[in-house]
């Protein structure tokens, strides 16, 4: 549940924040939520509503607007598109069906909450992941993935399709979830809607992008990466004939005995 604190209301719009929860109805629930510059941001249709700084239940605005007041922004484009997802890193990036929009100021205040369109690919309602300085996001049709990063040559953000060399793995299939395993091998895990999983070894600085289909012997319905303190591990919810199970993929770490290093598709020991 969400409690709205309206201790300080804006005089010119006295009912706006009173009805804030009211327009979160079944057809217009927030599509995503993020934490950026110590504010919680909620995304509904083409609106972004952000709380006051360090006061995550407070959408109040004072009579004389101050830098820590709540923020309400409409993401503007040639046509109205609802916000499908967003992700916060050094900048807040918002994805609609027709564009990628980035907060283009150093501070996020009521007077500096402007967004610049930096790309027309758009993004689906699949949560992106951050791989070092790169945002990995799914295209609107959910059949391709791009990496989104700052380009010094163009002085702007640009996307690169990282699935173009493995199109056969995405034909007639839609992407459901992404997960990123930073250690030990920098792998992006991709779950497709029919339950198949792909692994992408991704090292942008070395220009390494390598895709591999994974067979887990069942239908995977969700994926996630968790840390155990020493390594990051992939967890999967897998539907099998005798039920649904949460499973963990073993980590491929170096071992002392060469016989235990046998990780190949086809091989022979002699």
Question: What do the PLM-derived regions correspond to, one by one?
Answer:
Residues 1-27:
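Small/polar beta-strand repeat architecture
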Residues 24-28, 78-81, 90, 110-115, ...:
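Beta-sheet repeat architectures centered on beta-propellers
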Residues 27-69, 98, 104, 111-148:
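Carboxylate/His-rich catalytic cores and anion/metal-binding grooves
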Residues 31, 84-85, 91-93:
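Parallel beta-helix/beta-solenoid repeats that form elongated, surface-exposed shafts/blades used
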Residues 62-77, 89-92:
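Core mixed alpha/beta domains of very large multi-subunit molecular machines
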Residues 83, 97-98:
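Short glycine-rich loop/turn motifs
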Residues 101-102, 198:
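WD40 beta-propeller blade core
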């Amino acid at each position: 549940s969400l409690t709205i604190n309206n201790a300080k209301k804006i005089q010119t719009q006295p009912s706006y924040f009173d009805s804030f929860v009211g327009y979160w109805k079944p057809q217009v629930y927030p599509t995503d939520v993020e934490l950026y510059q110590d504010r919680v941001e909620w995304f509904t249709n083409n609106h972004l509503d952000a709380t006051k700084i360090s006061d995550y239940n407070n959408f109040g605005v004072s009579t004389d607007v101050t830098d820590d007041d709540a923020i309400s922004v409409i993401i503007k484009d040639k046509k109205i598109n609802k916000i499908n997802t967003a992700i916060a890193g050094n900048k807040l990036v918002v994805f609609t069906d027709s564009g990628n929009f980035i907060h283009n100021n150093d501070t996020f205040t009521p007077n500096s909450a402007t967004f610049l369109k930096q790309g027309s690919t758009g993004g689906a309602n699949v949560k992106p992941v951050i791989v070092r300085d790169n945002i990995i996001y799914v295209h609107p049709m959910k059949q391709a993935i791009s990496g989104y990063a700052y380009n010094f040559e163009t002085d702007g953000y640009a996307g690169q399709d990282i699935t173009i060399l493995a199109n056969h793995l995405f034909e007639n299939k839609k992407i459901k979830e992404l997960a990123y395993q930073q250690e030990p091998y920098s792998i992006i895990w991709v779950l497709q809607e029919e339950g198949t999983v792909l692994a992408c070894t991704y090292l942008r600085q070395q220009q390494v992008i390598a895709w591999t289909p994974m067979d887990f012997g069942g239908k995977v319905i969700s994926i996630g990466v968790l840390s155990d303190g020493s390594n990051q591990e992939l967890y999967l919810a897998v539907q099998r004939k005798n039920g649904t199970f949460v499973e963990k993929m073993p980590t491929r770490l170096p071992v002392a005995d060469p016989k235990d290093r046998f990780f190949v598709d086809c091989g022979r020991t002699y």
